[in-house]
Amino acid sequence: MTKVTKTKTYGLAKNSVWSSRASSIHVEGGTVYMAGAVNVINAGDVPVYWKNKVQHELEAEFDLKKCDYCKATPNDISVVKNDVIAVGDYYDESDFVDNYYTNGENKAALWVNKKLFKLCECCGSSSAKSVVVMDCSNKSC
C-alpha cells in the first residue's frame, strides 16, 4: 500500500495519514478520477475521491474519532455532466444488529457530488460494487 495523500484529511494534519488506497479509476476527457479511502491514524478510513491528484472527502454521518468500527468505502466512481457519482459500502456501529461488532451489516451507499445517500437502510446486508451512468439528455437511450 502506498501513501498518495499529502494533504490534511478529516481535519487532521497530513502526517496523521497512515495510508491511502484507490479502488476505482474513471477518466473523463483529460481528467482522472479515483475513488478510495485514506486511513488516518486513530480515526480509521475516510472515504475520498481524487480528481487529478486533488483529494475530496466524501460525506460520512458518523464521527470516526468516536466510532471504532465505522467505515465508508467507495468501490466505484463515474462522472456525468460534471456530477461525480460514487458507490460503495457504509457501516455505522450504531446500526448493530446484535452485541458483536462483526455481526453488523454493510449498507449500499451512493455519493453524488460528495453527498451521502444510503440505498437500502431497511434491508439486510447490501453493497454497491459498480456504477454505470449514461447521459441521455440529447438522445433516446
Give the positions of each predicted feature:
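Residue-level hotspots at or immediately adjacent to binding/recognition sites across diverse folds
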Residues: M1-C141
